[in-house]
Amino acid sequence: MTIAVYPGSFDPVTNGHLDIAARASRIFDTVIMAVFDRPNKQLLFSTEERVALLRESTRHLPRVKVDTYSTLTVDYVRSVGASVIVRGMRAVGDFEAEFQLAQINQTLAPDIDIVLFMASHRYTFFSSSTVREIASLGGDVSWLVPGPVVEALKRAYGRR
């Protein structure tokens, strides 16, 4: 059984994240979407909120599980018995950062493979920070994020 970990802050989870998770779950037996709990990072949603939103948003993906971690990613991957780290890339700009991160992780843990998924065309142009900015200005993000996230963003920015 192959377990893969898809780490991220998921602040908030987007349809692009869910697309990567769904595609990874067709290849791996289990995909753990691991929410990185970084108290020193400026986040809109708490770790608990991000986990709840992810769980609600992945109910339709039976092979996808949700967890949190606050250690080195490779240490977490080992602790759950996984052998693969899943990452998504939207555009060429992501390649440099993902390449450097992959090199670091492979140096720290040569036994863990890194699998990069290219974002589906319709998800290449936005990120969680783009979603937050649009939502903060009152824009419609329902085409970028799952329903539970739309409602959470409205609450976070005081809109109904």
Swiss-Prot record:
Site (Transition state stabilizer): 17
Cofactor(s) demanded: Mg(2+)
Residues annotated to bind substrate: 9, 41, 73, 87
Domain of life: Bacteria
Keyword hit for Acetylation: no
Residues annotated for ATP binding in this entry: 9-10, 17, 88-90, 98, 123-129
GO biological process: coenzyme A biosynthetic process
GO CC, one annotated term: cytoplasm
InterPro entries in the record: Cyt_trans-like, PPAT, Rossmann-like_a/b/a_fold
Catalytic activity, reaction form: (R)-4'-phosphopantetheine + ATP + H(+) = 3'-dephospho-CoA + diphosphate
EC number: 2.7.7.3
Subunit composition and interactions: Homohexamer.
Protein name: Phosphopantetheine adenylyltransferase
